[in-house]
Swiss-Prot record:
GO biological process: DNA biosynthetic process; thymidine metabolic process
A Gene Ontology cellular-component term: cytoplasm
Reactions catalysed: thymidine + ATP = dTMP + ADP + H(+)
Chief location of this protein within or outside the cell: cytoplasm
InterPro entries attached to this UniProt entry: P-loop_NTPase (IPR027417), Thymidine_kinase (IPR001267), Thymidine_kinase_CS (IPR020633)
Highest taxon, organism lineage: Archaea
PANTHER family linked: THYMIDINE KINASE, THYMIDINE KINASE, CYTOSOLIC
Protein's name according to its UniProt entry: Thymidine kinase
Known partners and oligomeric status: Homotetramer.
Length: 197
């Protein structure tokens, strides 16, 4: 068993779209920078909704980030940059888009004394768990579960409703579709719909 270095910690921020996950990630990283810890953010290259080079929350909050591909090489790049540049704190946005190897990589970084904060969706638009987030949740030292507000009734929303031409996307739609308010809404369990066709 590897010894746990002081300061190593794996934290996961999760919930549906529009719950404030990216905002919370940026706030936590900024807090560590204020505490004089060397910190960096990473984002998947697939997420270019608002910026090519920044992590950007739906509310407009933004922070410069390393952009890495959602491949095994991208996961290795996260480790290399973190260790070679001496980062004490790293944040990874939209972690659900990375391959499963990111789970072990982030766990190893935490074991080496890095404070790792991963932010990502827990469920896809059908209500099924994202495998990467699911695995990170069982390994996390701390879990921050955020809810949004249902766009139909105003109750706490725990689901991400995918829309196509303003209507719920059918079950056979592709799982990955990077988008914002034009493609998704936050919904409660009662108002989350996934038609078969």
């Amino acid at each position: 068993m590897k010894p746990m270095h002081p300061g190593g910690f794996l934290e996961v921020i999760t919930g549906p779209m529009f719950a404030g996950k990216t905002t919370e990630l940026i706030k936590r990283v900024e807090r560590q920078i204020f505490a004089k810890r060397k910190a960096a953010l990473f984002k998947p290259a697939i997420d270019n909704r608002y910026s090519e080079r920044e992590v950007v929350a739906h509310n407009g909050l933004r922070y410069e980030a390393f952009v890495v591909p959602t491949t095994e090489k991208g996961v290795e790049r996260i480790k290399e940059i973190t260790l070679n540049e001496g980062y004490e704190v790293i944040g990874i946005d939209e972690v659900q888009f990375f391959p499963m190897s990111v789970v072990e990589a982030l766990n190893e970084l935490a074991d080496q004394g890095i404070y790792v904060i991963a932010s990502g969706l827990n469920l896809d638009f059908k209500g099924d768990p994202f495998p990467v987030t699911k695995e990170l949740l069982v390994r996390a030292d701390n879990i921050v579960y955020l809810t949004a507000v249902c766009t139909v009734c105003g109750k706490p929303a725990t689901r991400s409703q995918r829309l196509i031409d303003g209507k719920p996307a059918p079950r056979n739609s592709p799982v990955i579709l990077v988008g914002g308010r034009e493609s998704y809404e936050a919904r409660c369990r009662e108002h989350h719909l996934v038609p078969d066709e």
